Structures are given as structure tokens and as C-alpha cells.
């Protein structure tokens, strides 16, 4: 499973002063506001942002990759990805993906958020070759808010929140790869889940 190493320790490091005083950590919410995170949400936001950084790294290494879901979990995070025919990600590929993630972190990219009307959201995802995101938009209620987070060249449909800059992600480790059916339905395509 892909996890932030010692996530609880890292979360405390991000929000604790060496003398034990709290240091506020801000997150970017989908309404565009940057607000201080409650302490119990810090680990989740770090993990969620790490999933986006991992997806960006995979997209840089595998430009034809098509992404489905990439949530934070209780133990880390993952992203489900559809790779072109004949292309597979295995644990042998983890060092290259982790190296690209480290580059993205070092670039200190700012997370930004924008809301789009349904037609524009679909057009954006179609233009980027993200068929699973288009299907997800189609499944949303007509009055749903559709927001996208961007860091650098990478854009992902997401409700957030996220860290403000990629440099806030201090440590991570790819730990596994498995298969996962799109939407958890065995009648759908098997995707690659990277943890």
C-alpha cells in the first residue's frame, strides 16, 4: 500500500513547533479559500495531496495514463489508473515514480482550484483524455459543484481540500500495486491500483 511514512509523526511535525506549540497548517478548499486545518484533518489532507502528486508523476512517466479515483485512506492512499495496452506498473517501477514525485515536491508547485459548469468540466476532461472522469461527471447530480485542482501541468477533478504547495509533502513510499475494477464492478475494466 502506498503510504506516507509514519504519517502521524509527519502530521505532527507539520503542525507542531519543537517546543510543542501548535503551528497552523493551511489547506486549499474547493471554494478557493485557504484556511487553517483542524488537527484531526491534517493527515487526511497530506495523504490526499500525495495521491495527486503520485498521479502527476505517473502521468509524466506514462503520458497515456487515464485516471479513475485517487482517495486518501485510513492507512495511506492510492490511485486507480488505466494504462495503455501492453504497459504495466510493477514494484520495479516504484523507484522511477518516487523519483518523479520527489521532483514535483522540489518544484514546490502551488495547488489551485477552479469550479466549472458541467459542459466545461466534461470538455476539459475529454480534452485531457480522462474518460473515467467524464463518466464520473455524467454520474453526478445535475446541480453538483464540479471542482478541479491543479498543480503545475496536472489537473484533477476533486472536492479537496489539499495542501497549498507540493513542498509540504515531506516523505512517502510506494508500497504495492494491485488490480481494481472500475467502480468496484467486476463487469467493468480492471484498472491498476498503485498504493
Predicted regions and their residues:
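Auxiliary tRNA-acceptor-end handling modules of aminoacyl-tRNA synthetases
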Residues: 4, 10, 23-46, 66-69, ...
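Active/ligand-binding-proximal structured segments within catalytic/core domains
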Residues: 41-61, 72
